[in-house]
Amino acid sequence: MHKYTIVIEKAEGNYSAYCPDLPGCIATGPTVEGTIQRMKEAIEFHIQGLKKERLAIPEPSAKAVSIEVAA
């Protein structure tokens, strides 16, 4: 089992997400929770495709941090 970092962004009317370790693996949803669920499904599908093509499955390496700056 792998634990991938995803980035979720607020869009106009919904949310979008991507996984930095899996280029092209994206999802959208009406809520944060819905987007997370769809992203999980997208990652699983993406990895299945890599396996089918006998390609290497990238190890999770992306890290996310929040920083505070003066505004």
Give the location of each predicted region.
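Extended rod-forming repeat segments used as scaffolds/tethers
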Residues: S16, T28, K51-E53
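Short aromatic-glycine-(Arg/Gly/Cys) micro-motifs in beta-strand/loop hairpins
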Residues: V7-L22
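Short, charged, surface-exposed hinge/linker loops at domain edges
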Residues: M1-T5, Q37-A71
